[in-house]
Amino acid sequence: MGLHLYDTRRRRVRPFEPLRPGHVGVYVCGPTVQAAPHVGHIRTALPFDLLRRWLVQSGRSVTFVQNVTDIDDKIIINADRDGTSVWELATRQTRAFDDAYRTLGILPPTIQPRATGHIPEMIALVSALVEGGYAYASGGSVWFRVGAFADYGALSHQRPDAMQPSVEAEPGKADPRDFALWKAARPGEPFWSSPWGDGRPGWHLECSAMAGKYLGPVFDIHGGGLDLVFPHHENERAQTVCAATARPASNAASADSPGPGGGEPGGGEPSSGEMARYWMHVGLLTTGGTKMSKSLGNSVLVADALDAVRPQVLRYHLLSAHYRSTLEYSAEALAESTAAHDRVETFVRNALDILGGPGEAAALAADEVVSSVAGAQPTVAGARPVPVPGPGGESRLTPRRAWSDFTIAMDDDLAVGRALAALFGAVSQGNQVLSKAHSRELAGWVDVTRRMLNIFGLDPHEQWPTAGAEFRPALDGAMQVVLDLRSAARARRDYAEADAIRSRLAAAGLIVEDTPEGQRWHLA
């Protein structure tokens, strides 16, 4: 089957065919660092992390670019309100976003450009648009001429003549729909020199310039939240396609690129005149049925969310629905995700304990599922593909068949519902053979479970290393002494003492479980 992805521009799922075989260029619109990150930001970022991991697993190298918008009207307003500088606010909140992404296991971008570090590229892009007749200067600002782009509205599937005026209702615009490429300087605001006077870039311009610098005028995948389809991505596409057409052929996508309007009419495949071959958008995160956003005052900060649940659980919950669907965030939904995640994590932990650890499990699993998950962490561009089991044709569920089901689901536009069904099927089968110590069958099930968890960024052994790992041998030894004391209490039928020991350990964050194979412990 191969990977298929839904393309917003074409309104259908299409086979994924990168421009360069074996390599994928991805640009995702990153945060405007005006305030602390909320859960909605993570909801948008995680599906692209999942996609990236799957692309690498499938044998492709990935150049993943995610920008930081560090100059914007909202940043200026918030900095003024807080009595701080724009630069201090932007730097502080950029760190907060980086910390939140890292805490949630999101792989760092290959390139993370800041808008303010790319002003020359933005000025060059505006100059090309002005020279090509697609933009005009007025009062120190520069506006994109929407009427000059015949395909405007194609991404968001709107008719240009039915569109409302842009939010920038300022004098000097030739058409109410025109949007700002360059904004004339205002008193007290940051500015840069330009051929049109002092000013600063418009929001849409920033992403076009940075995507073009690092991925070229045409690249594979452009992503973001559903709320960015219009006007942000529509405007990005318009100015990028027109700039590529206006520039000399050596700087454009192709010497024989079509004029503004890009791909073939009537739903044909995107051509070299497009900005991105595939446009992907993540559905909204809601709370109480209403979109979560700062402007509505119902956003939940990542820091507050992590006071309620572990990072792994939050990551699981935000990935548990298909990326194009709406996902509800509530205490009840988080409780369900906690139970589901704990079931998987408990199986992996118990299985690895029985089998003697990841290395031993991998060796036992070699005959069962061809190769081990050990060392299969997705990495940045250039990573080698991980060996995977071949397609399964078994009538009964086996680790090989479970992986095949998982692969088919992920290749179908990241169908996480079916992928999670394959995961929980593997966990269920593994739990049934959990008592078979050093069983190849158990090793096979835990191996394939960890393969799937690895794609979701949730392998409890590999993806979430415990801080203070150098103290683990000492902790293991100390815990064995305590567990021996508890065993002695049970042997003399002093169950009150045994329960008291377990309760005191639980209060300290150390969970003891009694199993047919003996006592096991793990961190809460």
From Swiss-Prot:
Ranges of compositional bias, category Low complexity: 246-258
Gene Ontology terms for molecular function: ATP binding; cysteine-tRNA ligase activity; zinc ion binding
One Pfam family named in its UniProt record: tRNA-synt_1e
BP GO terms, sorted: cysteinyl-tRNA aminoacylation
Keywords tagged on the record: Aminoacyl-tRNA synthetase, ATP-binding, Cytoplasm, Ligase, Metal-binding, Nucleotide-binding, Protein biosynthesis, Zinc
Major location category of this protein: cytoplasm
Location within or outside the cell: Cytoplasm
Positions occupied by motif 'HIGH' region: 31-41
SMART domains noted in UniProt: DALR_2 (SM00840)
Cofactor(s) this protein requires: Zn(2+)
Transferase in keyword set: no
InterPro entries given in the database record: Cys-tRNA-ligase, Cys-tRNA-synt_Ia_DALR, Cys-tRNA/MSH_ligase, CysS_C, Rossmann-like_a/b/a_fold, tRNA-synt_1_cat_dom, tRNAsynth_Ia_anticodon-bd
Residue numbers covered by motif 'KMSKS' region: 291-295
Region (Disordered): 246-273
Positions annotated to bind Zn(2+): 29, 207, 232, 236
Composition skew (Gly residues), residue ranges: 259-270
Binding, ATP: 294
One cellular-component annotation, GO: cytosol
CDD domains on file: CysRS_core (cd00672)
Family: Belongs to the class-I aminoacyl-tRNA synthetase family.
Subunit structure: Monomer.
Name assigned to this protein: Cysteine--tRNA ligase
Organism: Frankia casuarinae (strain DSM 45818 / CECT 9043 / HFP020203 / CcI3)
Name of the gene encoding the protein in the UniProt record: cysS
